[in-house]
């Protein structure tokens, strides 16, 4: 299990309360997962921190929605986080949630395809399949790697993406779900 400092746990608990409050009006997470929020959402997001060697980086989280994993990783110490979310209501929530973190959090209310930005690491959770993700981020420069939280169809997604893209990848087991995987993708290039 992960060792998490008390100060971070306290901030994550505040974040959890905020998500639950806002979820009643803008559906940030599935109602079926609210009862198990800490395991299903907080730990699922927080586990990515073990694959981030240097926290003094710029991380971009696409399709941020409820701030998972972006806000959680910012609270856990990632120095600069940009959250890209097209839904204005969710951006208003993200603005409130970003105040919980001591680090630099930028909210970008645009479609991912329109955003031009450079980062060290790109994350997303419950967003889309690999092909769609890779197509959406054509204007985002990812210097180091992608950390993508995936479910049971991860192998199919890899096979399908390999038909259009060249990339290296590692598969890590999720600590929160047997079917869950973390895809660590690097050196992404579109085939000609």
UniProtKB/Swiss-Prot annotation:
Q: Which Pfam families match?
A: GidB (PF02527)
Catalyzed chemical reaction(s): guanosine(527) in 16S rRNA + S-adenosyl-L-methionine = N(7)-methylguanosine(527) in 16S rRNA + S-adenosyl-L-homocysteine
Q: One Gene Ontology cellular component annotation?
A: cytosol
Q: Which SUPFAM superfamilies match?
A: S-adenosyl-L-methionine-dependent methyltransferases
Entry EC number(s) = 2.1.1.170
Where is this chain primarily localised?
Answer: cytoplasm
Q: Where do the annotations place S-adenosyl-L-methionine binding?
A: 63, 68, 112-113, 125
* Compartments reported by the entry: Cytoplasm
Per its record, how is this protein called by name? Ribosomal RNA small subunit methyltransferase G
Which organism was this protein described from?
Answer: Rickettsia rickettsii (strain Iowa)
């Amino acid at each position: 299990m992960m060792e998490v400092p008390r100060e971070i746990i306290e901030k994550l608990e505040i974040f959890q309360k905020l998500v639950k409050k806002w979820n009643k009006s803008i559906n940030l997470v599935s109602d079926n997962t609210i009862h198990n929020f800490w395991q299903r959402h907080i730990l699922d997001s927080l586990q990515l921190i073990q694959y981030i060697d240097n926290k003094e980086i710029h991380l971009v989280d696409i399709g941020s929605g409820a701030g998972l994993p972006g806000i959680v990783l910012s609270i856990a110490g990632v120095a600069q986080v940009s959250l890209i979310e097209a839904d204005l209501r969710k951006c208003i929530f993200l603005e409130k949630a970003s105040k919980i973190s001591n680090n630099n959090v930028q909210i970008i209310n645009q479609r991912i395809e329109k955003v031009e930005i450079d980062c060290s690491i790109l994350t997303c959770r419950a967003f889309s399949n690999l092909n769609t993700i890779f197509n959406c981020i054509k204007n985002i420069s990812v210097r180091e790697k992608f950390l993508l939280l995936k479910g049971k169809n991860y192998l199919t997604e890899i096979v399908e993406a390999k038909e259009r893209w060249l990339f290296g990848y590692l598969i890590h087991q999720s600590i929160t779900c047997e079917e869950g995987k973390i895809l660590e993708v690097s050196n992404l290039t579109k085939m000609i």
